[in-house]
């Protein structure tokens, strides 16, 4: 199996960065997913990973590429995990320092509501009452607000801390719970001045999809980078507060740093 993996990985040499290749290698070796499935996985990376595709995605970006450290990219993952210029990052963090909660990532808001009715989180794969019971296991109750955020492929995929506080836990959620179908799920739990805040990171089902830049018991400031998706499409923020004071609107596009409360 290991020989097959290495042979297939050679086919994407120079297509994805070394760190990404190693992450995928580690995953497929641990999962024993089989030769044919592995081949499909690699071919999927190859098909997505073309210079023309990158150029198309750049044109689709709603924000200026001048915000980023690089405007030209060697491969798709180089584009997908691009970093903001330090001056732009500092500007966003400075504008957010007196805010309670911010948008943690570039997104379109799919839904906003209260956990007493999560039916508008449109990609939940289980009945709402069952999802609530699952989330109660990690400390979420039906008095929380939620913001459900969609990340498109052209978007900036670094994720930043939506609040200032202490990282209480980084929880991988078993796919057996199937909150988001077979997709992977991490929950970041914060202790803050406004109570516990939860950030759900929903990734692609077949790959190791999130690299953390934080650890449990670490104190973070609002806007700090907490990690990046290697492949992912959804985040959900859960927090308490006056629902009527939430500043963002459903179906609108937002960049990281926009004020929620």
Per-segment meaning from a language model:
Residues 1-261:
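Contiguous, well-folded functional domains in the mature portion of proteins
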